[in-house]
Amino acid sequence: MAHQAHSYHMVDPSPWPIFGATAALLTTSGLIMWFHYNSLYLLTLGLLSMFLVMIQWWRDIVRESTFQGHHTPTVQKGLRYGMILFITSEAFFFLGFFWAFFHSSLAPTPELGAQWPPTGINPLNPLEVPLLNTAILLASGVTVTWAHHSITESNRKQAIHALSLTIILGFYFTALQAMEYHEASFSIADGVYGSTFFVATGFHGLHVIIGSSFLTVCLLRLIKFHFTTNHHFGFEAAAWYWHFVDVIWLFLYMSIYWWGS
């Protein structure tokens, strides 16, 4: 930073935002093709493109922060504010799904049989797989906090152990959710109940996959000695995001699975 008289990071031009946006367009278009035409080609291309962009964008950020020293305290403060605002926007994103659910369930229309769950819908038992998933996510919240405390106390071995456990629990949750979707007696096409259930829980599941990927990158960085006791915002951001995913699941469980059944 000796060549400039301020502590801000002047970011170099990057191709990844436009490539990432293109990959997102391919992925969402691929989802439509999969839903309507049962074709996975475009979705596969979109996901592969997204994966490649993610790897290279993360590589650039790691290079700028860890090896070039661009992430000064001023930059880290800005990143913290950015992550807080991002998580706030995500909370409002999920608020829309909860609004749709309660709008439909608190005053069911005659088309739904004037009852909730609607006529013909056999809801999932909230005391079976959903309760197990709740326990898994709560346990993962404990392990990610354990990892954070281990990093701040310079206990690298425990940090790696705790973070590995968190990632395993995250992927276990995803596997159970996929199994639950496969065994559900209703689909996304089964009226407003199917739509709100699968869109809300599906987007939450997507956030779990994103969070698990985020934590996996943090684990690789931890193994490569990228984090210190006072410079590990990449991990902090991932932990904040993971706790947010936990809280959203608790609201989903209590409203859609438990109250809504």
Curated annotation (Swiss-Prot):
Taken from the record's topology, the Mitochondrial matrix segments are: 1-15, 67-72, 153-155, 224-232
Coiled-coil residues are: none
Keyword Nucleus recorded: no
Query: Top enzyme class of this protein?
Result: translocase
Gene Ontology terms: biological process: mitochondrial electron transport, cytochrome c to oxygen
The disulfide bridges present are: none
Q: Name one GO cellular component term.
A: respiratory chain complex IV
Residues that span the membrane, as ranges: 16-34, 41-66, 73-105, 129-152, 156-183, 191-223, 233-256
Query: Can you name one GO molecular function term for this protein?
Result: cytochrome-c oxidase activity
One Pfam entry name:
COX3
Q: Which transformation does this protein catalyse, written as a reaction?
A: 4 Fe(II)-[cytochrome c] + O2 + 8 H(+)(in) = 4 Fe(III)-[cytochrome c] + 2 H2O + 4 H(+)(out)
**What does the record say about its membrane topology?**
Multi-pass membrane protein
| Complex formation | Component of the cytochrome c oxidase (complex IV, CIV), a multisubunit enzyme composed of 14 subunits. The complex is composed of a catalytic core of 3 subunits MT-CO1, MT-CO2 and MT-CO3, encoded in the mitochondrial DNA, and 11 supernumerary subunits COX4I, COX5A, COX5B, COX6A, COX6B, COX6C, COX7A, COX7B, COX7C, COX8 and NDUFA4, which are encoded in the nuclear genome.
Q: What is this protein called?
A: Cytochrome c oxidase subunit 3
UniProt organism field: Struthio camelus (Common ostrich)
